UniProtKB/Swiss-Prot annotation:
This is Enolase. Keywords: Cytoplasm, Glycolysis, Lyase, Magnesium, Metal-binding, Secreted. The keyword Metal-binding applies. It comes from the Bacteria. Its EC number is 4.2.1.11. GO terms for cellular component: cell surface; extracellular region; phosphopyruvate hydratase complex.
């Protein structure tokens, strides 16, 4: 038994200067777990609710004192005396206590912070690393892998104040033999890209996720700049480095007109036309993964996209699936996409997150563990990626300590596990292995 004696919630700051919830869980014997909830900018409409205070006189309405009060009040009372090793039971207690479909009473930010803190406290009580405890909870004890990183080196959309409509342009160091080598390759391309952008007279200011946020003539111009940067860094595009995109297409979808409006380059597309636009990019560049290539509700369009490209590249559902097993099952049953992005604050507990990962893997989908644009120094997703052998991780660029914290944790884990956690590179990407 690792009984909970105290649960503490507090309001802390995230990487965008907005409040978020941090929770501490204290166990008998002095064991402690602490975790913070992240926050998204481009959010799916079906995500679990992030509870904000709405008091415009305080943090412009974005305070989280209501969520913190839920942690310090009803959640703390309900969990006191319970065994922290019983993760699923404790998560269910919080879900039932909240009593809403989308965790609107307490907020997914409150429930998730406690859920993750429980797991960390339990790992502490077991005297094992968090990734090892997560593997136990996942039913795969001792099974690990180092994730292939998707490094977001050009930011657009809701993550930057620029003319680029597509939200993320990412590189994947598929030619590396280890995570450490892959991280180095990514960093070298990132610095090479800074020189390319400067030489063309572009800004090298960074967006929410640490990537550069230049004003470019088109979305394809971002891919062209990265292509030059990869070559200048001494790598071969398509062999050493592959490309990935997160369109976050819901953000530029005009629901009334039923069109995809790339305002930055003055182009408009129907659903089918946008699929062909994306297909064209994959033919000109080694893009092996596209996330949220259409609006979250455009299921007919996604069916077409999957038929068009699903046997060649990875099609990732983020806003589409929101880490929700009910929605994911519908996608699996209807042949929609072939991969899922996992963001634990979209669903609100570690147990539900693990269930989504299992369902995806059982269906032959690939899994990408992801940060949010509003992050903290909390590096739990690094342990989640290794402990579930997810295979891929998205945690931003090679700048901003809120992003680099996750990479540094992965370096530590790889050092500790060595050959027990293989780095499989391109084999992890759907359609490429």
């Amino acid at each position: 038994m690792a009984n909970i004696i105290k649960v503490i919630g507090r309001e802390i700051m995230d990487s965008r200067g907005n409040p978020t919830v941090e929770a501490e869980v204290h166990l008998e014997g002095g064991f402690i777990g602490m975790a913070a909830a992240p926050s998204g900018a481009s959010t799916g409409s079906r995500e679990a609710l992030e509870l904000r205070d709405g008091d415009k006189a305080r943090y412009l309405g974005k305070g989280v004192l209501k969520a913190v009060a839920a942690v310090n009040g009803p959640i703390a009372e309900a969990l006191k005396g319970k065994d922290a090793l019983a993760q699923a039971e404790l998560d269910q207690i919080m879900i039932d206590l909240d009593g809403t479909e989308n965790k609107a009473k307490f907020g997914a930010n409150a429930i998730l912070a406690v859920s993750l803190a429980v797991a960390k406290a339990a790992a502490d009580a077991k005297h094992v690393p968090l990734y090892a405890h997560i593997a136990d909870l996942n039913g795969t004890p001792g099974v690990y892998s180092m994730p292939l990183p998707m490094m977001n080196i050009i930011n657009g959309g809701e993550h930057a104040d620029n003319s680029v409509d597509i939200q993320e342009f990412m590189i994947q160091p598929v030619g590396a033999k280890t995570f450490r080598e892959g991280l180095r390759m990514g960093a070298e391309v990132f610095h090479s890209l800074a020189k390319v952008l400067k030489a063309d007279g572009h800004s090298t200011a960074v967006g929410d996720e640490g990537g550069f946020a230049p004003n470019l003539a088109s979305n394809e111009a971002a891919l062209a700049a990265i292509k030059v940067a990869v070559a200048n860094a001494g790598y071969e595009l398509g062999k050493d480095i592959t490309l990935a995109m997160d369109c976050a297409a819901s953000e530029f979808y005009d629901k009334e007109a039923n069109i995809y409006d790339l305002k930055g380059e003055g182009k408009k597309f129907t659903s089918e036309e946008f699929n062909f636009f994306l297909q064209g990019l994959t033919e000109r560049y080694p893009i092996v993964s596209i996330e949220d290539g259409l609006d979250e509700s455009d299921w007919d369009g996604f069916a077409h996209q999957t038929k068009l490209m699903g046997d060649k590249i990875q099609l990732v559902g983020d806003d589409l699936f929101v880490t929700n097993t009910k929605i994911l099952k519908r996608g699996i049953d209807n042949g929609i996409a072939n991969s899922i992005l996992i963001k634990f604050n979209q669903i609100g507990t570690l147990t539900e997150t693990l269930a989504a990962i299992k369902m995806a893997k059982d269906a032959g989908f690939t899994v990408v563990i992801s940060h949010r644009s509003g992050e903290t120094e909390d590096s739990t997703i690094a342990d989640l990626a290794v402990g579930t052998a997810a295979g891929q991780i998205k945690t931003g660029s090679l700048s901003r300590s809120d992003r680099v914290a996750k990479y540094n944790q992965l370096l530590r884990i790889e050092e500790a596990l060595g050959s027990k956690a293989p780095y499989n590179g391109l084999k992890e990407v759907k359609g490429q292995g």
